[in-house]
Amino acid sequence: MAKEGAIEVEGRIIEPLPNAMFRVELDNGHKVLAHISGKMRQHYIRILPEDRVVVELSPYDLTRGRIVYRYK
């Protein structure tokens, strides 16, 4: 269930960071810092560099986001 007003964009994982954080390059060229959503963490979904993902951005801070889906 997406939050009200969240912006969903696609991107690619550039590098993993500590504490389940990742640097993601969006399709439009911007780089954001993103963490894994709770459901993905709960189901042990692994994310590796170069994976394609969907990131949910808050309209208040476009430099941080939450990874909500990993493409197969």
Swiss-Prot record:
GO terms for cellular component: cytosol. One of its GO terms (molecular function) is ribosome binding. It holds the Pfam family eIF-1a. Belongs to the IF-1 family. Component of the 30S ribosomal translation pre-initiation complex which assembles on the 30S ribosome in the order IF-2 and IF-3, IF-1 and N-formylmethionyl-tRNA(fMet); mRNA recruitment can occur at any time during PIC assembly. NCBIfam families: infA. One of the essential components for the initiation of protein synthesis. Stabilizes the binding of IF-2 and IF-3 on the 30S subunit to which N-formylmethionyl-tRNA(fMet) subsequently binds. Helps modulate mRNA selection, yielding the 30S pre-initiation complex (PIC). Upon addition of the 50S ribosomal subunit IF-1, IF-2 and IF-3 are released leaving the mature 70S translation initiation complex. This is Translation initiation factor IF-1. It comes from Corynebacterium diphtheriae (strain ATCC 700971 / NCTC 13129 / Biotype gravis).
